[in-house]
Amino acid sequence: MALVSDHPLHLLGLRFPLRLRVTVRQGFVTLHNEITTKKLASGDSFVVPAFLRFACDVMPGRGKPAVFTLALEDDEPDGGHGGGKRWSQALAQHIFDTPQGKWTAARLAALWQVTPHKARARLFSEGEALLSLVREQRLAHALHTAAQADADGEQGERDLAQVAAGSGFASIPAFCDACVDVAGVRPSLFLRGPAPG
């Protein structure tokens, strides 16, 4: 399944714990960060490196919606750790894998076998904060889940409540707030029925 948009979308602040292949089926997608820009048209794909923060501008074609897919790829075994963010990327992967978990400093400390203060200090030294990372990765999980609907045999509309709960958000308003605050869009813009043809 793919994400479909009849209107231009500007998704901001996206970051996934693994490499992400973006494939455009219809319309145009521009991926960019502070260093580079990659423009994709129908049939093009590009792999965004793991844990790289990027924006995604989606532009439908004339009279046709934009259709694109997101697929996580296993990281290369000798690949780097998110630009020197070893602890943050490892935590992001844990959060993405189990977004419904209660991600607290105590849980993180137990996972890393350090004190909660030391766990927070590790994230801080990499320019990250626990709650921000949790929110970001839950949203990444929700976006990936929305893109995977029907690929896993699910049919019909992607339900906002199911995506929100499955991605660890306490409520639909919390999910909507995260979409607006982190990605800059309302979830209703990308949570819709199956892609055309």
Model regions: which residues?
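Short, Lys/Arg-enriched anionic-surface-contact patches
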Residues: P77-S88, E128-R138
